[in-house]
Amino acid sequence: MEPAPELLFYVNGRKVVEKQVDPETMLLPYLRKKLRLTGTKYGCGGGGCGACTVMISRYNRVTKKIRHYPVNACLTPICSLYGAAVTTVEGIGSTTTRLHPVQERIAKFHGTQCGFCTPGMVMSMYALLRNHPEPTLDQLADALGGNLCRCTGYRPIIEAYKTFCKTSDCCQNKENGFCCLDQGINGLPEVEEENQTRPNLFSEEEYLPLDPTQELIFPPELMTMAEKQPQRTRVFSGERMMWISPVTLKALLEAKSTYPQAPVVMGNTSVGPGVKFKGIFHPVIISPDSIEELNVVSHTHSGLTLGAGLSLAQVKDILADVVQKVPEENAQTYRALLKHLGTLAGSQIRNMASLGGHIISRHLDSDLNPLLAVGNCTLNVLSKEGERQIPLDEQFLSRCPEADLKPQEILASVHIPYSRKWEFVLAFRQAQRKQNALAIVNSGMRVFFGEGDGIIRELAISYGGVGPTIICAKNSCQKLIGRSWNEEMLDTACRLILDEVSLPGSAPGGKVEFKRTLIISFLFKFYLEVSQILKRMAPGLSPHLADKYESALQDLHARYSWSTLKDQDVDARQLSQDPIGHPVMHLSGVKHATGEAIYLDDMPAVDQELFMAFVTSPRAHAKIVSTDLLEALSLPGVVDIVTAEHLQDGNTFYTEKLLAADEVLCVGQLVCAVIAESEVQAKQAAKQVKIVYEDLEPVILSIEEAIEQKSFFEPERKLEYGNVDEAFKVVDQILEGEIHMGGQEHFYMETQSVLVVPKGEDQEMDVYASTQFPKYIQDMVAAVLKLPVNKVMCHVKRVGGAFGGKVFKASIMAAIAAFAANKHGRAVRCILERGEDMLITGGRHPYLGKYKAGFMNDGRIVALDVEHYSNGGCSLDESLLVIEMGLLKMENAYKFPNLRCRGWACRTNLPSNTAFRGFGFPQAGLITECCITEVAAKCGLSPEKVRAINFYKEIDQTPYKQEINAKNLTQCWNECLAKSSYFQRKVAVEKFNAENYWKQRGLAIIPFKYPRGLGSVAYGQAAALVHVYLDGSVLVTHGGIEMGQGVHTKMIQVVSRELKMPMSNVHLRGTSTETVPNTNASGGSVVADLNGLAVKDACQTLLKRLEPIINKNPQGTWKEWAQAAFDKSISLSATGYFRGYDSNIDWDKGEGHPFEYFVYGAACSEVEIDCLTGDHKTIRTDIVMDVGYSINPALDIGQVEGAFIQGMGLYTIEELHYSPQGILYSRGPNQYKIPAICDIPAELNVTFLPPSEKSNTLYSSKGLGESGVFMGCSVFFAIREAVCAARQARGLSAPWKLSSPLTPEKIRMACEDKFTKMIPRDKPGSYVPWNVPV
């Protein structure tokens, strides 16, 4: 085989020809680094987040059709693109040409915040529209199922793209003739108050129409190439790897014969992650290209034969067509496969992964192989020696040599037989998330009865996720042959299968008892569903099923359907150009949607730029015995390796060590940094650094271990109000309890990133970073380099999400990179991979709350004694502040007359946990709400009644003796009760629960009072700089960081109001310590407030200075006023400053005025749970908030919704797993699940109270970004109510030990029944668990 001279494909309509191709190159770095198309983003590198989505188009010479489909560029080898047309976000529209409607609508519907995920969203939707110009809502949800967003909560994205759907209208409540945006209470429109107008969040008449004729045409050259059907195998050779692309079946078999160990790669979704994450290397890869025999679709009298080269998306489409055409009795297996194909991965992976690759990979959690195994499927395999058939059975799945493919064979096709009359095939799965998540357990089950007799003739049951491969319960099934289909058979089957499909207590993946329960819960579902079918076919054969059991037959599907948004009215007397109070689009929204928004790693490489990669500790607590750098230093491209020894006394900054010196304190601690010419060279060399460790004791991982070892960061914090001990003596009842709450990964879409550029003179250094705290980077870099701070400047254009995770961690990276940059006089770039980021950086603090409550029988809590413990990790970071804020906010909406709360930050051997949105309140508030809920249960009262009876009075005092006016708390609560129709729906929920046994619903309403402030005047100061240029344009700079919350947009709104000029006249370049020095970190939802007051101050200074000129020419323009000022030597620049609110707290006295104001609200959520699987769906959520006067309702609603969904994830599905050795397992989207589009409430309603009072804040506004996280616990408590209802129906005590998150595992195991009692349980201490709680 001769090497191919060139690789030819198209990108955005432009021809690309590569003559020297490295087969190890993926499309993503090629687009970004080679073609400089940086709109396609790196999010995870494993196909799990969708940030790198592009569209690929190929011409099929057989069908004469062009296929458009989305793929993950991070997993797409560039060698696989021969003859393809690639379309990126830049190729469909731009601000300099024309916007595509897909780009325009997501921006105008306020569907972008940080914007990092937006290009991927845009391309997924674009690919859908190329195939379905008027998609259905189901197709829309399916298309976006592989795209993650951490900011928006998805609602505005769906609303934007619903406008393309067949059923799309801006509302779905048209019976009364009113738009959903104008719905009032009970569907009646609200009466507008005089002198007020309601601004629309978006305007439908402004949409650009979708015009398919304006799309990029498929390159004719590629059609001609495809029609010619080239016969020559293409071979691309790199330094380490050879890529072979046969174009005929004969050539493929020849290649496989020559290189029998080479994997056959179609979509690279299995081999690719193995190479990237497991270090598996393949010197030769065989990748067939458009071989017709591998794409066959053949119908025979016995069934359907599908080519192994078909993508899973194609298989899904084929099966959907087949089930419409063949009789239902013949389509059982096809329907079951379709069910799993709808949730398997995301659309991008399904379009890349092939049927054959999925089968051959034999992953233990494969969704299709259990079904194919029970369906009596056959594999047709080929080699040069000929063709043969292999049964897809247990032996094949367990890789028995005699039942497997030989090394020189390839899988050509799969035969899937028709099912028969009296034969039933069903599919089951349960995952942490409904879509785009690997199954915890899945199953395929098939039964065949004798003609009309109800006797089992054949039975096949397979499970995935419960062993090293797919497990077939062959022996159990054999013993059940000849049995009647009844409950006695079911009971026997459960016991047989539990014996045969045994899981050791230390099984990988953990959740052992849950998996055991799912094994037989699925079997029971199979029994019920088959019984129901038999009831329809032959009523006499079916065992009797109670009506209340029928709900078990339906899976939970909660597709988002609609929302209502009730923001505030704008005073009609407001100047028309005054944008304050209007839903102004995020000013980077369009740039987000076109890929033109520049993030740090989008910046072009600096001349002679170096790359930095870290070596991290694999031990939780160990002594560094020796470090051998010689082999790593000898590798090509390696320039240097930085260790703690090089940094000397600059290695410690405050409490943080930049690099480990003699001892490591956690897995993931930075030990040294490799500096090399390229990213690949740096990462390869990092693997060759040899470090010898000696383990040390103790290794403390959990809060309980820290308490036992008295391992705390000092000091203890304490607040006390009243006399707790005396109050306990006079109460009616006392209860004690505790709750453990797991941590949370920030999962910002843009990973930690830094670029340090030495300026070449005076030791000046420019640092570009994705950070919330540029001043801290400036200070740390200056300290490490022993320079005055004025030599170091830190610049931030925008940040692709942060949530508190980019306050301190980026500073360590920047300081080490700066040391190397300074030493070598060359720029140094460092971009963490997703797994590195999650391993190194820490997240939200896990919490343990212990409480003792004394209360009266009417629910009034008289005394409360609470202890808070947080898992701080191995260094202090912000752990003390998190404990302090948790204590100051722990009482939430309630006045406890006697309160004592104490808090400790635990020192453990985990990566240091840090700031996270909410800053202690999501944990502290949950502890209090759990206590309230338990009190209600003890009193026999409803939780909402006990909550209301303990509310703050209108004028009251907090435990730290700050005065409070809680009028809006009560108003939010009452409005939420009314708007959610709480009491009516509670009756409906009770009725539903009485009529259903295996499905239960829960309804919960939670209030909140979120204090806003930083507890210090110094932390609240802010500054700004405003320039007016002679053409009348304005440049504004301030100290806040744009990380998705829209602070730059709000600052321009402030300038527009104050200077009475259009927003289009105002520009903001970014944030820099060069223009605004000595800034505080951006966080705590105070960024717009504090910096806005500084901007306002600067504008007022300018206006005062220019007052004589403006008075002299009141009808003039800013251009005229600026020129006149210049002529009179009047400065057109002004700094603005805000000193911070008067806030303080004296911890010794336990009193002070730490907060400027309070944000009030309430959230009501309704859920439905599946008691057999632990699955849940959120049916509806209503949120009412007091936001003061909203500066920008669109941005503020986005903050509320995004925070709520993030909080919902925190309390339900986001789960971190650590090994007993302290190793974090959850290092990417495949292991750690944040909410996806499938998880949001089916109905979401957000209401802002009208502004009710003037305040000292910016235009009487309130910060909202943090408070909304806690509202997610309304879903948590709704799940609790549903579980309690299930337990009561089973005669169990309703209260049960709560912990967060309430995952499917915890929900299922709390719904105790005969199946949970049937499973074997391992004695604690008899095995080493796979994971441990921390």
UniProtKB/Swiss-Prot annotation:
This protein's name: Aldehyde oxidase 1
Chain sites annotated for binding FAD: V264, V265, M266, G267, N268, T269, S270, V271, A345, S354, H358, D367, L411
Annotated EC: 1.2.3.1, 1.17.3.-
GO terms (BP aspect): lipid metabolic process; xenobiotic metabolic process
Primary gene name: AOX1
Organism listed in the record: Oryctolagus cuniculus
Domain FAD-binding PCMH-type as annotated: residue spans: 236-421
Domain 2Fe-2S ferredoxin-type: 5-92
Main localization, broad class: cytoplasm
UniProt modified residues of type Phosphoserine: S1064
Catalytic activity: an aldehyde + O2 + H2O = a carboxylate + H2O2 + H(+); retinal + O2 + H2O = retinoate + H2O2 + H(+); all-trans-retinal + O2 + H2O = all-trans-retinoate + H2O2 + H(+)
Xref: PROSITE patterns: 2FE2S_FER_1, 2FE2S_FER_2, FAD_PCMH, MOLYBDOPTERIN_EUK
Annotated function: Oxidase with broad substrate specificity, oxidizing aromatic azaheterocycles, such as N1-methylnicotinamide, N-methylphthalazinium and phthalazine, as well as aldehydes, such as benzaldehyde, retinal, pyridoxal, and vanillin. Plays a key role in the metabolism of xenobiotics and drugs containing aromatic azaheterocyclic substituents. Participates in the bioactivation of prodrugs such as famciclovir, catalyzing the oxidation step from 6-deoxypenciclovir to penciclovir, which is a potent antiviral agent. Is probably involved in the regulation of reactive oxygen species homeostasis.
Organismal lineage: Eukaryota, Metazoa, Chordata, Craniata, Vertebrata
Positions with a binding annotation for [2Fe-2S] cluster 2: C114, C117, C149, C151
Compartments in which it is found: Cytoplasm
Positions annotated to bind Mo-molybdopterin: Q113, C151, A802, F803, M1043, G1084, S1085, V1086, V1087, Q1199, L1264
Active site: E1266
Activity regulation as described: Inhibited by hydralazine and menadione. Not inhibited by BOF-4272 or allopurinol, xanthine dehydrogenase potent inhibitors. In contrast to guinea pig, human and rat, isovanillin is not an inhibitor but a substrate for AOX1 in rabbit.
NCBIfam families per UniProt: mam_aldehyde_ox
Cofactor: [2Fe-2S] cluster; FAD; Mo-molybdopterin
Additional free-text comment from the UniProt record: The reaction follows an ordered Bi-Bi kinetic mechanism. During retinal oxidation, incorporates the oxygen of water into retinoate, but not that of molecular oxygen.
Alphabetical list of SUPFAM superfamilies matching this protein: 2Fe-2S ferredoxin-like (SSF54292), CO dehydrogenase flavoprotein C-terminal domain-like (SSF55447), CO dehydrogenase ISP C-domain like (SSF47741), CO dehydrogenase molybdoprotein N-domain-like (SSF54665), FAD-binding/transporter-associated domain-like (SSF56176), Molybdenum cofactor-binding domain (SSF56003)
One of the record's GO molecular function terms: iron ion binding
Keywords of this entry: 2Fe-2S, Cytoplasm, FAD, Flavoprotein, Iron, Iron-sulfur, Lipid metabolism, Metal-binding, Molybdenum, Oxidoreductase, Phosphoprotein
GO CC terms, sorted: cytosol
Tissue-by-tissue expression: Very high expression in liver and lung. High expression in kidney, pancreas, brain stem and spinal cord. Moderate expression in heart, testis, eye, cerebral cortex and cerebellum. Low expression in stomach and muscle.
Family: Belongs to the xanthine dehydrogenase family.
Quaternary data: Homodimer.
